[in-house]
């Protein structure tokens, strides 16, 4: 399986982590605040990945990078007293740790300086687009885009995210218009091997994914549902994918000429 749809920047994601050590001095409320900044949500009832729950001086965290393991971090005053790994389904303790690293719950999480710059760029492009709609007498599109984008900006400023945050990924990753989006390829080692099964079916779909996505996003942009920059939240083109992919094995019982000549 290959991933050609854009995700957040590997540089931003790798920087947004929280390291907790046994014996570390940290206030409980400060720790919870940092979890929220990493897009974790508090839920004492439905405990799933990307969630945390609090009971007295004890915090259970279900790390985004793990599938079936959670961590229990116990505090004594302003000090981390204990860190234990447990099964969130049964509550059974597995082992203790001296330190753990908690990764962000979203690939679109962005350091504050870059986030502030992204907000400025979004406002700048919004102003340009609204002027275009005003000049073309498209009042409905004008109002729709203004309300939607300003609401998103308020949410981003308050919480660091919003519904559909991926549509602003170009600003968050600091890319120029038309640049390829960050993808899973940026997260894998350089010595990786890509294996594509049924490649005579899979590979031709790559261009189709890009064209279909662009057509849909252009409609959203034309009618004021999104800024034109949403078109840069896209899958890779075939040319970009072909240049970016690691060494690849194409598995096919009926390869066509186009596949043979890749």
Regions found by a protein language model. Name each.
Residues 1-260:
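ASCE RecA-like P-loop NTPase motor cores
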């Amino acid at each position: 399986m290959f991933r050609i749809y854009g995700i957040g920047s590997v540089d931003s994601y790798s920087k947004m982590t929280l390291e907790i050590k046994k014996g570390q001095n940290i206030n409980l409320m400060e720790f919870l605040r940092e979890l929220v900044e990493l897009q974790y949500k508090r839920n004492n009832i439905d405990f799933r990945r990307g969630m945390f729950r609090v009971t007295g001086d004890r915090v259970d965290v279900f790390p985004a990078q793990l599938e079936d393991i959670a961590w229990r971090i116990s505090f004594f005053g302003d000090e981390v007293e204990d860190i234990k790994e447990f099964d969130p389904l049964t509550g059974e303790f597995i082992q203790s740790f001296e330190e753990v690293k908690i990764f962000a719950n979203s690939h679109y999480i962005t350091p504050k300086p870059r986030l502030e710059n992204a907000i400025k760029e979004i406002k700048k492009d919004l102003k340009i687009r609204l002027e275009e709609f005003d000049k073309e007498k498209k009042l409905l599109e004008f109002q729709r885009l203004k309300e939607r984008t300003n609401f998103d900006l308020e949410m981003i400023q308050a919480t660091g995210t919003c519904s559909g945050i991926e549509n602003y990924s170009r600003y968050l990753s600091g890319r120029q218009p038309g640049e390829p989006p960050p993808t899973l390829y940026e997260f894998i080692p350089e010595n990786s091997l890509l294996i594509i099964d049924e490649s005579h079916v899979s590979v031709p779909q790559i261009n189709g994914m890009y064209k279909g996505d662009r057509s849909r996003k252009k409609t959203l942009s034309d009618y004021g549902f999104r800024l034109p920059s949403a078109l840069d939240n896209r899958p890779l083109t075939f040319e970009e994918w072909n240049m970016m992919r690691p060494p690849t094995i194409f598995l096919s019982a009926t390869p066509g000429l186009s596949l043979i000549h890749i």
